[in-house]
C-alpha cells in the first residue's frame, strides 16, 4: 500500500469534506436528488429523440449523444461519491480510481468536441438552410460523433497512465472527493513540469481549440442572422441557437473559472464546490435548458404522453 510507485498502491483515501460530517449529510441528500433528476432528465431526452419521428434530425441526434455523455459522466463518479459521503469509508481502490480518471478525461474531452460539432450543425442550419439536410447527412453525423469519441478516448489514453504512474512515496490521501487529475498530480513526490506541460498541450487541443471553433461558428451565425430583414425571423434564428449557447457558456465558463485562475486566488473548498457544480449541476441543467427553451422537444413530450394516454383508454 505504501510503495514508492503509484502502481503499487491498492487504494486512495478521498478526504473531501470528511472533517465536516454535518456538511457531508447535507451534501448526500442534495447530490442524491440531483443525480436522480439528472438520470430522469437525460434519459427522457434520449428516449424522446429516438421515439418521436419529428426529432429524427441532426440536431437531436447530437443532443441525444450529449445526454448520453452527461449520464455516463455523472454515473462514473457520483455513486462512489454518495458511498463515501454516507459512511466512514472514504477509500477508493486503485483500479476504481484508474477507471474513474480514464472516464473523466475521456468523457470530458468528448463533450468539448461534441459541443463544437453541435455549433457547426447550428451554423450550417442558419447559414445554409436550403442545403442543411444534404450537408448534415446521416453518414457525416455518424462520422463526426465517431471522431469526437475517438479523440476523447485518445486524450484519456495519453493522460491517465502517466498520471497514475507518478511516484507518490507512499502518499495515498487525495485532498478532494473525486479522482481529479490535478489533485493526483499534486500528490507526486517528483517534478511534474513535464506532465503539466503535456496536460497544457492536450488541453489546448481538446478544450481550447473546440472553444475557438465554437466562437468562429457563432460569428458566422450572428452575421447571417443580422442579414435577415424581419424581426421575427431573427428571433427564430437566435432561438434555435439559444439552448446550445447557454450550455456552452455553462460548460466552458465553469472549466475556465476552475482551471484558468491563479491557484492562490481560490481556496481548496471553493475548488471542490466548483467541481461539484461541474459534475452534478451542469448535467442536471442541460436537459432542462433544452426542454424549457425548445418547443419541438416540449411538443414531442406532449405527443408521447398523449399517445400513452390514448392507448391506456383503449
UniProtKB/Swiss-Prot annotation:
Main location: membrane
Compartments it resides in: Cell membrane
Stretches of the chain found on the membrane's Extracellular side: 1-25, 80-100, 159-195, 260-272
Source species, domain of life: Eukaryota
Family annotation (PROSITE patterns): G_PROTEIN_RECEP_F1_1, G_PROTEIN_RECEP_F1_2
GO molecular function: G protein-coupled receptor activity; olfactory receptor activity
Membrane-topology annotation of the record: Multi-pass membrane protein
Record-level GO BP terms: detection of chemical stimulus involved in sensory perception of smell
Protein name: Olfactory receptor 2W3
Natural source organism: Homo sapiens (Human)
Name of the gene: OR2W3
